[in-house]
Each structure stands twice: as C-alpha cells, then as structure tokens.
C-alpha cells in the first residue's frame, strides 16, 4: 500500500494491486473514500469521489480536505500513480500540514 501524501491527517494512498482508472484512496480514522481521475488527451477533466465497498466514507471537514487536496495536487498524484504502476519507480511520501487556501 504505497502512501503518497498525508494532508491534515488524511492519508492518501493506493493499493499495490490497483487498476485503471487512475485513482487514490483517502483515509482518516477508519473512514475511507476513493477519487477517480478522468483524463482526456492528457488533461484531467474530472475527479469523482466514490465509495469504497465495505468502508464508511469520509465525511465533513475530512471529505472537504480530501477534495481540496485532490484539486490542488491532481497532476502530482497522477504522476506518482503512473511512475509506480507503469514505470515501477519508488515514490516519495509527502506530509503536508499547512492548509491549502
């Protein structure tokens, strides 16, 4: 389970056996949601938050923090996903404790 970011306590990661579409999971205190990235002609055109089967979803401020982070770091998240799954590179974990405004 490569952890790629932590933002204000929300852990952002993917499972090592993942598949397309490109997506990441956000987890906080046992709650978990996932975000799928829809890409057309190399551009991210949409990010959809989805439920994770068997898990209670992120709620309230944690869900909002996850959404804000995804919007700001979408390109970097996709880059890390591609590096890990397509190029089998090690990826760096980054912890961010400053709120995005």
Positions of predicted regions on the chain:
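Broad hydrophobic/π-residue packing in well-ordered secondary structure
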Residues: 10-12, 16, 34-36, 74-83
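Acidic, low-complexity intrinsically disordered segments
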Residues: 55-101
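Short, charged/polar N-terminal "headpieces" of proteins
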Residues: 1-32
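A short, structured beta-strand/loop element
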Residues: 20-60
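Residues in flexible loops and secondary-structure boundaries
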Residues: 9, 15, 20-22, 43-45, ...
């Amino acid at each position: 389970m490569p952890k790629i970011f932590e933002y204000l306590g929300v852990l952002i990661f993917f499972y090592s056996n993942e598949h397309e579409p490109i997506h990441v999971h956000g987890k906080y205190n046992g709650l978990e949601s996932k975000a799928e990235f829809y890409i057309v002609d190399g551009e991210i055109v949409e990010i959809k938050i989805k439920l994770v089967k068997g898990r209670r979803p992120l709620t309230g401020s944690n869900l909002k923090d996850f959404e804000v982070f995804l919007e700001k770091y979408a390109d970097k998240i996709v880059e890390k996903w591609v590096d890990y799954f397509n190029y089998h590179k090690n990826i760096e974990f980054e912890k961010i404790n400053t709120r995005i405004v």
